[in-house]
C-alpha cells in the first residue's frame, strides 16, 4: 500500500504521475495527473458522461453527488485544481475519455451550484428532489443539441438522479445546509 500526500509524484515505468487529493465527491477521492498525455484520471471529480449523453452540440456531463461525503464547495475547489493544469483530456471512471474544454468544466460547475441551491427546497422529499434534478439535467442537455425522446432520457438519468438526490440529502443532514 502506498499512502500518497497531495501533490506526491509516482514514477510508473519512467512516466511521472502526480496525485492530487480532490475532495467533494468523497473525502478519500484523488485524481492522477499524467503530464505526458496532458490528462487527468479524474475518477468522479469531473463527473459522469455516458456515451448516450454525447450529442452533436456537445457532451452532457453530470456531477456525482453521491452519499455519504458529498461537499459542494470542496467539489468546486477540486474542479479548479483539475482546470489549473490546462488539461487536454479527462479519463473519466464513468465512462471513457473526454476531450477537456472550459465549456465542459463550466457546465459541471453550474450544475454543482444549481444542485446546492435546489436541495434545500426538497430537504424532506427525495422523490421531488430527484424530479427537480432530472428536470434541470434535461434543460442542460437541451443546450447540447438534438436529443432523443425526453421520457427515454429521463429514464436513463433515473439511477444517477436517485444517487445524487441521496447525496444532497445526506449533505444537508450532515451540515445543516439550507435548513
Segments and roles (model prediction):
Residues 1-2, 9, 38, 121-129:
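Generic structural signal for short, solvent-exposed loop/turn connectors between secondary structure elements
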Amino acid at each position: 500500500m502506498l499512502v500518497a500526500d497531495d501533490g506526491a509524484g509516482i514514477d510508473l515505468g519512467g512516466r511521472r504521475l502526480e496525485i492530487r487529493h480532490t475532495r467533494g465527491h468523497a473525502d478519500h477521492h484523488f485524481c492522477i495527473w499524467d503530464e505526458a498525455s496532458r490528462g487527468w484520471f479524474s475518477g468522479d471529480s469531473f463527473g459522469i458522461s455516458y456515451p448516450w449523453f454525447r450529442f452533436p452540440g456537445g457532451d452532457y456531463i453530470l456531477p456525482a453527488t453521491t452519499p455519504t461525503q458529498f461537499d459542494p464547495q470542496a467539489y468546486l475547489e477540486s474542479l479548479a485544481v483539475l482546470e489549473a493544469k490546462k488539461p487536454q483530456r479527462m479519463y473519466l471512471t464513468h465512462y471513457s475519455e473526454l476531450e477537456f474544454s472550459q465549456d465542459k468544466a463550466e457546465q459541471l460547475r453550474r450544475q454543482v451550484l444549481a444542485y446546492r441551491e435546489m436541495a434545500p427546497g426538497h430537504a424532506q422529499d427525495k422523490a421531488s428532489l430527484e424530479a427537480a434534478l432530472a428536470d434541470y439535467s434535461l434543460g442542460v442537455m437541451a443546450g447540447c443539441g438534438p436529443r432523443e425522446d425526453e421520457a427515454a432520457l429521463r429514464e436513463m438519468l433515473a439511477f444517477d438522479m436517485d444517487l445524487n438526490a441521496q447525496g444532497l440529502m445526506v449533505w444537508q443532514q450532515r451540515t445543516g445546509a439550507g435548513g
